[in-house]
């Protein structure tokens, strides 16, 4: 295959990977043109000779730390696909001052050590003095969205009624808000420094407006922490708080009773298991049954928010269409209906709640009873293994 053919194949592959197959006869209209890779190489091979200049060139730099691709065709193709994802993201974000690079774990081991790169096949994002490990889906759109968030300030200011309403509408992730005198306040600066530690995974908000603070029942230099899907906040004690106090509080409370699996942080969430297991709930929010089940989950979570042993991961299948067939096959479940079960993160063994009536969802009380059995160990994936062994013996 010559260079021109190879380039054509790479472009076609990227479009299929990122944008899907184009419909025959459908052309992009002005204002709705999806980006197509223009063939310009923007992703830099970062090494000992050029890494200092590369860091000086970009406000934000995303580096893929990778092991050398194997010689087989599948490994080579996989690496090309990953490189093409970075190329499209680099093209889209070129005017934003975002650069992209590759660091080979063998050829450039010395550079990797200097930069603190430790986990292969991970993307590390450098912004000023902060290093952020990207733990999300390896796709151009998700990566671009994440990096646009990185470019934003770590603290968003609430200055009026509309911004307050937008803040209150955020329910599916942890959020913090503090009330301070002004930007020069030493307590606001401590809050901002703490925000940088969690940016962009956890949103931090602040207000200098006494009217906004009154509606939020915030006192001066007070910080409220909202757990995901919880209506009432918890106030960080002993105001005014230092950066260390804020960071420690967030670290201690960041695992919500109910948390949503999101493309931009899916691996971080999945790796934060409870003794090797996850309680996983599948529910399509756009589906009537899924919405109803999600409301039941919220109610149960709100009633049990003080239980540190309970954490449920909610997955909306609509967010991960490529994973739906895998989940259905691996867990032997039908994701066209809501499901909740226990998953072993080591071997993907699972056991799922049986619904007495397929047309009726469990009540909050029934779900709480089931969760209590899970937490007490009466329902676990080992029991499922024992049943499989019994079936084998019968054979």
Curated annotation (Swiss-Prot):
Any one Gene Ontology cellular component term annotated for this protein: Z disc
Region: Disordered, residue numbers: 376-395
Keywords: Calcium, Endoplasmic reticulum, Glycoprotein, Membrane, Metal-binding, Mitochondrion, Muscle protein, Phosphoprotein, Sarcoplasmic reticulum, Signal
Sites bearing Phosphotyrosine, chain numbering: 37
Main location per the UniProt record: endoplasmic reticulum
Chain segments annotated as coiled-coil in the UniProt record: none
Short name of any one Pfam family annotated for the protein: Calsequestrin
Chain positions found as Phosphothreonine: 118
Subcellular location: Endoplasmic reticulum; Sarcoplasmic reticulum; Sarcoplasmic reticulum lumen; Mitochondrion matrix
BP terms from Gene Ontology: positive regulation of release of sequestered calcium ion into cytosol; positive regulation of store-operated calcium channel activity; protein polymerization; regulation of skeletal muscle contraction by regulation of release of sequestered calcium ion; regulation of store-operated calcium entry; sarcomere organization
Function of the molecule: Calsequestrin is a high-capacity, moderate affinity, calcium-binding protein and thus acts as an internal calcium store in muscle. Calcium ions are bound by clusters of acidic residues at the protein surface, often at the interface between subunits. Can bind around 80 Ca(2+) ions. Regulates the release of lumenal Ca(2+) via the calcium release channel RYR1; this plays an important role in triggering muscle contraction. Negatively regulates store-operated Ca(2+) entry (SOCE) activity.
SUBUNIT field: Monomer; increases in response to a depletion of intracellular calcium. Homodimer. Homotetramer and homopolymer. Can form linear homooligomers. Ca(2+) ions promote oligomerization. Interacts (via C-terminal end and preferentially with the monomeric form) with STIM1; this interaction increases in response to a depletion of intracellular calcium, decreases both STIM1 aggregation and clustering, interaction of STIM1 with ORAI1 and store-operated Ca(2+) entry (SOCE) activity. Interacts with ASPH and TRDN.
Protein name: Calsequestrin-1
Species for this entry: Oryctolagus cuniculus
């Amino acid at each position: 295959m010559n260079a021109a053919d190879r380039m054509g194949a790479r472009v076609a592959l990227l479009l299929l990977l990122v944008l899907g197959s184009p419909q025959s006869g459908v052309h992009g209209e002005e204002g709705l043109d999806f980006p197509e890779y223009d063939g310009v190489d923007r992703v830099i091979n970062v090494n000992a000779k050029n890494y200092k200049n590369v860091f000086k060139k970009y406000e934000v730099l995303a580096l893929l730390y990778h092991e050398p691709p194997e010689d087989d065709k599948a490994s080579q193709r996989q690496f090309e696909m990953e490189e093409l994802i970075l190329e499209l993201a680099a093209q889209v974000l070129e005017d934003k001052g975002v650069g992209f690079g590759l660091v080979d774990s063998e050829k450039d081991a010395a550079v990797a050590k200097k930069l603190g790169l430790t986990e292969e096949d991970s993307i590390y994002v450098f912004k000023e003095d902060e290093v952020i490990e990207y733990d999300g889906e390896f796709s151009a759109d998700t990566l671009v969205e994440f990096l646009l968030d990185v470019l934003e300030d770590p603290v968003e200011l609430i200055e009026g009624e509309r911004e307050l309403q937008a803040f209150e509408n955020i329910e599916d992730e942890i959020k913090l808000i503090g009330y301070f005198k002004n930007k020069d306040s030493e307590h606001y600066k401590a809050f901002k420094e703490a925000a940088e530690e969690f940016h962009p995974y956890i949103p931090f908000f602040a207000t200098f407006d006494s009217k906004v603070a009154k509606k939020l029942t915030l006192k001066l230099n007070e910080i409220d922490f909202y757990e995901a899907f919880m209506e009432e906040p918890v106030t960080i004690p002993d105001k005014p708080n230092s950066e260390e106090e804020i960071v420690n509080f967030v670290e201690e409370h960041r695992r919500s009773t109910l948390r949503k699996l999101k493309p931009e942080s899916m691996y971080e969430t999945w790796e934060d298991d409870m003794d090797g297991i996850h309680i996983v709930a599948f529910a399509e929010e756009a589906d009537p049954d899924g919405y109803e089940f999600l409301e039941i989950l919220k109610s149960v979570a709100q009633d049990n928010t003080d239980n540190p042993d309970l954490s449920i991961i909610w997955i909306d299948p609509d967010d991960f269409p490529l994973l739906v067939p895998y989940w259905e096959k691996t867990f032997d479940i039908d994701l066209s209906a809501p499901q909740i079960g226990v998953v072993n993160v080591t071997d993907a063994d699972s056991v799922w709640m049986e619904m007495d009536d397929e047309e009726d969802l469990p009540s909050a009380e029934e779900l709480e009873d089931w969760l209590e059995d899970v937490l007490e160990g009466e329902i676990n994936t080992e029991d499922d293994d024992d049943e499989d062994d019994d079936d084998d013996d019968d054979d």
